[in-house]
Amino acid sequence: MVQLSYVIEFVGDMERAVKFYRDVVGLPLKFQSVGWSEFSTGDTTLGLHPASEKNTAGKVEIGLNVPDLHNFYDEMRAKGVKFSMPPKMQDFGGMLAQFEDSEGAYVSVSGK
């Protein structure tokens, strides 16, 4: 089963974005730093990451988790999805693949 694991918003001003989601929206802040902030939202994580030239402010990345990443990758490619990164072991120790959805949002998929 495909599960929504996280949503990352790329932000132009980390402090302003943290204040908005913490003080206005009311999400409990789990962690805050200059390069990453994270909120408690139940089973799904909301993360804030500094914007860059590639990931401009307001752009969103969606994170999915699947039980079998290689099988998911093969199924999605058979349906015409073009991956920007095939399944690859990451520095943090997890396996990850990436593609863009029909609207241009980045989607990262983790799994075994």
Regions picked out by a protein language model, each given a short descriptive name:
Residues F20, G58, H70-E75:
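Short amphipathic alpha-helices within nucleic acid-binding modules
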Residues D13-P28:
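Amphipathic alpha-helical segments
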Residues Y73-D74, K79-K112:
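Vicinal oxygen chelate
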Residues P28-V60, Y106-G111:
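Conserved short beta-strand elements that form part of the metal-binding/catalytic scaffold
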Residues R22-D23, S40, R77:
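Alpha-helical segments within the soluble intracellular
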Residues D13-M14, P67-L69:
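Helix N-cap motif at beta-to-alpha junctions
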Residues M1-R16, T45, V60-I62:
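N-terminal beta-strand motif that seeds the catalytic metal site of vicinal oxygen chelate
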